[in-house]
């Protein structure tokens, strides 16, 4: 059987409002997630009768106990009736510290793929509950649908957004999410609004001004991109993005991007490429019976 390549797609926060800080230190948010048809790729080779997990290539500076891929697999292993292991191969295309969900998406793909390959039998809700232990963004990747998120990101309302193309730039810096949310200068008082009102209003990112102040390269990239199209930062950065009606317009601007920044063009997707892959595999399995 041919090895299956499982996608771990990027996401964008089309807006991000910080509504307040909870007593436990987490923040109340309202945000809108959409997936992109661009991301990392993972391959999984199941290893029966062992709990061994290996990842290649290793991510420099990230030990196994901190790696979200290994941590996701360990969480799933704990739900199995008998030992199962895996050798995992990662093709890393998404930047770390970029605000486009690279680590969270890898974790979600690991949960979804190994749940299938190990025949663990966990449902979507159970996988999402495991995912939230790894990060607030993991459940949206597990569920695989563009969504309006509230709370700390755990309350998800699926949405259907118009098709669009995006140009994403990665400034040459790494933004730590925890540092942004711990910063005393972060705005934390945006009033909560109903989703339909948010859709009709001006989309913004409450983290953007702070991150631009702390990371001048983000401000430079955003300023450059704003010359061509309305642009915002995604998540807590460092990536910034602009929306276009068609691929041609986005690629014309990509061709002009200064060499000091990495960038890519991708299509927005309401259904995650991971969800599409899982459905295709499930259909193949049914057809073989």
Swiss-Prot record:
Any single GO BP term: terpenoid biosynthetic process
Keywords on this record?
ATP-binding, Isoprene biosynthesis, Kinase, Nucleotide-binding, Transferase
- Residues reported in the UniProt entry to bind ATP: 95-105
**Functional note:** Catalyzes the phosphorylation of the position 2 hydroxy group of 4-diphosphocytidyl-2C-methyl-D-erythritol.
Molecular function, one GO term? 4-(cytidine 5'-diphospho)-2-C-methyl-D-erythritol kinase activity
**Which InterPro entries does the protein's record reference?**
GHMP_kinase_C_dom (IPR013750), GHMP_kinase_C_sf (IPR036554), GHMP_kinase_N_dom (IPR006204), IspE (IPR004424), Ribosomal_Su5_D2-typ_SF (IPR020568), Ribsml_uS5_D2-typ_fold_subgr (IPR014721)
Taxonomic lineage is: Bacteria, Pseudomonadati, Pseudomonadota, Gammaproteobacteria, Aeromonadales
Name the pathway it acts in.
Isoprenoid biosynthesis; isopentenyl diphosphate biosynthesis via DXP pathway; isopentenyl diphosphate from 1-deoxy-D-xylulose 5-phosphate: step 3/6
Please verify whether the record's keywords include Nucleotidyltransferase: no
- Statement: the UniProt record of this protein carries the keyword Transferase: yes
Name of the molecule in the record: 4-diphosphocytidyl-2-C-methyl-D-erythritol kinase
Listed Pfam families:
GHMP_kinases_C, GHMP_kinases_N
Q: What is its EC number?
A: 2.7.1.148
Record family assignment:
Belongs to the GHMP kinase family. IspE subfamily.
Instruction: Give the annotated active site.
Output: 11, 137
Q: Which organism is it from?
A: Aeromonas salmonicida (strain A449)
**Where would you find the membrane-spanning parts of this chain?**
none
- Report the NCBIfam families cross-referenced here: ispE, PRK14608.1
Reactions accelerated catalytically: 4-CDP-2-C-methyl-D-erythritol + ATP = 4-CDP-2-C-methyl-D-erythritol 2-phosphate + ADP + H(+)
Q: Which Gene3D superfamilies match?
A: 3.30.230.10, GHMP kinase, C-terminal domain
